């Protein structure tokens, strides 16, 4: 190499160093040009997909991403901080949403048929599990189905009047609550059965409309 340099067929070592630096700069410029070309293609694709939205807010979103970019580890740490600050509140909210989705899924599985839903619940879960899972909701639902025959009998006897007034047990509740006071009030102000029957004979329209309720 030294002989070739002396004969002038090869450049000196200093010239070789300069050539190497130029080659490195050329490669670096080529890499940067490739990245710019890729960025331009990505920007063109985003602008084509989202239209004027990215043209108007793209720079703002990019700047915000640069300022507040969070790594995946930081996201996990943020979740841990929330769990420490709020305790079981977030877990309770998640569990309630999951229970609601499970209940909706089971109701859809029965196609909206209450009888099939009750059959499914009776054969799949114990009362303790039902109470733990749904609380008082299913107890009220089952109670309403158990009293279906009784309610049908009351409606058949008293018609639409009971829907406006209520069930006849309200008078018994008052008697239990106020004791002998209501008994004296009944004897003093309310008509007896004989008076009620005579009143029904005098007013057949009332008897036809309200049945035996008016005799009470």
Swiss-Prot record:
- What GO biological process terms does the UniProt entry carry, in alphabetical order? chemical synaptic transmission; neuropeptide signaling pathway; sensory perception
Pro-piece positions: 64-85, 93-131, 144-155, 165-175, 183-207
Matching Pfam families, A to Z? Opiods_neuropep
- Which subcellular locations apply to this protein? Secreted
Entry keyword Secreted: yes
Q: What is the name of the protein in this document?
A: Proenkephalin-A-B
Question: Which GO cellular component terms are attached?
Answer: axon terminus; dendrite; extracellular region; neuronal cell body; plasma membrane
Q: Which InterPro entries match?
A: Opioid_neupept, Proenkphlin_A
Q: Which UniProt keywords apply?
A: Cleavage on pair of basic residues, Disulfide bond, Endorphin, Neuropeptide, Opioid peptide, Secreted
- Where the protein is mainly located, per its record? secreted
Reported modifications of this chain? The N-terminal domain contains 6 conserved cysteines thought to be involved in disulfide bonding and/or processing.
Instruction: Show the segment(s) annotated as Disordered.
Output: 114-133
Superkingdom per UniProt: Eukaryota
What does the protein in this record do? Enkephalin neuropeptides compete with and mimic the effects of opiate drugs. They play a role in a number of physiologic functions, including pain perception and responses to stress.
Which source organism? Xenopus laevis (African clawed frog)
Family that this chain belongs to: Belongs to the opioid neuropeptide precursor family.
Sample GO molecular function, one term:
opioid peptide activity
Q: Does this entry carry the keyword Transmembrane helix?
A: no
């Amino acid at each position: 190499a030294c002989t070739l340099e002396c004969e002038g067929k090869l450049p000196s070592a200093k010239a070789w160093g300069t050539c190497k630096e130029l080659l490195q700069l050329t490669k670096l410029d080529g890499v940067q040009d490739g990245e710019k070309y890729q960025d331009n293609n990505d920007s063109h694709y985003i602008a084509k997909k989202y239209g004027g939205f990215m043209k108007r807010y793209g720079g703002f979103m990019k700047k915000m991403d640069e300022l507040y970019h969070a790594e995946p580890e930081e996201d996990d740490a943020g979740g841990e901080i929330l769990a420490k600050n709020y305790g079981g509140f977030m877990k309770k909210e998640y569990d309630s949403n999951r229970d609601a989705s499970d209940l909706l899924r089971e109701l859809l599985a029965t196609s909206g048929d209450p009888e099939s839903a009750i059959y499914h619940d009776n054969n799949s879960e114990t009362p303790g599990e039902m109470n733990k899972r749904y609380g008082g909701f299913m107890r009220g639902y089952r109670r309403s189905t158990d009293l279906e025959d009784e309610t049908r009998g009351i409606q058949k006897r008293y018609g639409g009047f009971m829907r406006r007034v209520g069930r006849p047990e309200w008078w018994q509740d008052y008697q239990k609550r106020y004791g002998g006071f209501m008994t004296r009030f009944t004897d003093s102000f309310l008509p007896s059965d004989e008076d009620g029957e005579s009143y029904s004979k005098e007013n057949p329209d009332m008897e036809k409309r309200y049945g035996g309720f008016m005799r009470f």
